[in-house]
């Protein structure tokens, strides 16, 4: 048995969930009265995203906890990060970009995940205030020979920063420029200049490419000093289909 931490990622492409009355009715049955009020307040596109996200989270967590999805009670920490009460500790985090929802789950420790679509029209230098000089230099390193790498590198750095603040639950209150990432061929180095250096070492990061035009990054708080985690990734359409997928790790020569 592996001594690495185990992380499961569930990818749900919203556009592949059938838009028919039977599916909608079935999914709505999993919402609490408070969640139904929230659902009713959204515009149709946002309401659909909220509904599918909730059903995805509840079905996956119910399986982990050995309970019914109707029994999954999602609560919020004071910092706004969601958690679930159960017979054992299960940590999770949710993200979405365009019509892709990603849920990351583990029993190891706090986890954060962020996904972004790689927009090759994005003027990333307009947000260079959130980047350390060393990050800017790395992003532009191959600009003359491979211009597309600039965007992949920028969105990798961005998702790494977001995954960390989602893992810690501190949100955008933390100055992103002070979260410095150095992406090496074998691992990702991280320095949080606003925090204790020893605490920084508790976090482990990985980045992946999904369907060629999305990048997602995972931040895992390693409570047992394990250097890596095993990732099992699935495409899941709740109550419709599930199959294993293999996202491509972000690598650079």
List PLM regions with ranges.
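Core catalytic alpha/beta fold that binds nucleotide/phospho-ligands
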Residues: 1-253
């Amino acid at each position: 048995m592996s001594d690495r931490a185990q992380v499961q990622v569930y990818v749900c492409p919203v556009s592949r969930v059938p838009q028919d009355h039977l599916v909608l009715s079935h999914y709505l049955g999993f919402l609490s009265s408070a969640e139904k009020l929230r659902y009713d307040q959204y515009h149709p596109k946002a309401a659909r995203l909220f509904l599918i996200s909730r059903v995805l989270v509840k079905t996956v967590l119910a399986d982990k906890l050995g309970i019914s999805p109707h029994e999954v009670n999602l609560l919020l920490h004071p910092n706004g990060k969601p958690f679930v009460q159960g017979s054992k500790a299960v940590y999770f985090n949710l993200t979405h970009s365009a019509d892709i929802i990603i849920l990351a789950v583990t029993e190891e420790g706090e986890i954060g995940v962020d996904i972004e679509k790689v927009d090759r029209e994005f003027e990333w230098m307009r947000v260079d205030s959130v980047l350390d000089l060393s990050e800017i230099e790395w992003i532009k390193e191959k600009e003359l020979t491979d211009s597309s790498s600039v965007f992949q590198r920028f969105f990798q750095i961005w998702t790494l920063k977001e995954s960390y603040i989602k893992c810690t639950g501190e949100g955008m209150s933390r100055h992103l420029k002070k979260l410095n990432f150095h992406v090496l061929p074998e691992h990702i180095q991280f320095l949080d200049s606003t925090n204790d250096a020893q605490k920084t070492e508790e976090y482990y990061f990985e980045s992946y490419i999904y369907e060629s035009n999305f990048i997602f990054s995972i931040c895992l708080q390693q409570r047992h000093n394990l250097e890596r985690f095993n990732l099992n990734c699935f495409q899941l359409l709740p109550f419709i289909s599930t199959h294993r997928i293999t996202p491509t790790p972000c690598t650079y020569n």
